[in-house]
Amino acid sequence: MKLKREYDELIKADAVKEIAKELGSRPLEVALPEKYIARHEEKFNMACEHILEKDPSLFPILKNNEFTLYLKETQVPNTLEDYFIRLASTILSQQISGQAAESIKARVVSLYGGAFPDYKILFEDFKDPAKCAEIAKCGLSKRKMIYLESLAVYFTEKYKDIEKLFGQKDNDEEVIESLVTNVKGIGPWSAKMFLISGLKRMDVFAPEDLGIARGFSKYLSDKPELEKELMRERKVVKKSKIKHKKYNWKIYDDDIMEKCSETFSPYRSVFMFILWRLASTNTDAMMKAEENFVKS
């Protein structure tokens, strides 16, 4: 607890220095506009309050654009079928562009009369070679056909367990383990993204994500004292999973990123969105990517 308080104090101290540098003698205002608060759901507003209390310098990133995932107007009850479609979309989008993934998904929807097939239908259709051939013609590789079938089997055979698993709280690791163990093609990163966008879990952090790593590098670039402290207090080194290519930004190891992110717990999912925004150099592209992430 003592060490965590020290990290919190360093983050806030570095933030105050940076804000003072930018604002000079102008008063600091970190209260989000009432209209902004009214449009977002309560748990997101609570997250913002917590994050800004820890680091006021993040105010502009939060204030400048709404967060689609947490808008009240986007909140709808999710069914087991919704979760299946979201995970199926994750599989379809792997290793290809967003536009290509949308095109493949649209062809699957067209094949099934205007709606993405539910898991029970796909479970039966994967037993029929002729139907499998039709699905594959939509643009799915052999590997993605295997992955999609695995997902359909998982939901069909374990739907009661899944309903219970997804309906519980504070079981993020259990959800990740179940998905990674039972569904071919779903790894830890994909499972974490589902926790955020599908189950709306608020305390997820993925240091293995390239955008998060880049945003974190920018975040720490003006916090020298915090960086020194994080480096000094390392106990267990967890190497970054990101290959060290010739990036023009510093890649930090996972343990450094995770330790720093703990300051923003239990709202690290929102901190991830902030880091994604810090990583982006194109606001319009960033907002479009967020919208696609919410829909996928």
From Swiss-Prot:
Subcellular location as annotated: Nucleus
Biological processes, Gene Ontology terms: base-excision repair, AP site formation; DNA alkylation repair
Modified residues (Phosphoserine): S110
Annotated site residue numbers, Determinant for substrate specificity and/or activity: W189
Pfam families tied to this protein: HhH-GPD (PF00730)
Cellular compartments per GO CC: nucleus; protein-DNA complex
Top-level taxon in the UniProt lineage: Eukaryota
GO MF annotation terms: alkylated DNA binding; alkylbase DNA N-glycosylase activity; damaged DNA binding; DNA-3-methyladenine glycosylase activity; DNA-7-methylguanine glycosylase activity
Catalytic activity: Hydrolysis of alkylated DNA, releasing 3-methyladenine, 3-methylguanine, 7-methylguanine and 7-methyladenine
Record CDD domains: ENDO3c (cd00056)
Induction (UniProt): By DNA damage.
EC number: 3.2.2.21
Keyword annotations: DNA damage, DNA repair, Hydrolase, Nucleus, Phosphoprotein
Enzyme active site: D209 (proton acceptor)
Biological role stated in the UniProt entry: Hydrolysis of the deoxyribose N-glycosidic bond to excise 3-methyladenine or 7-methyladenine from the damaged DNA polymer formed by alkylation lesions.
Sequence similarity: Belongs to the alkylbase DNA glycosidase AlkA family.
Name of protein: DNA-3-methyladenine glycosylase
Gene symbol of the encoding locus: MAG1
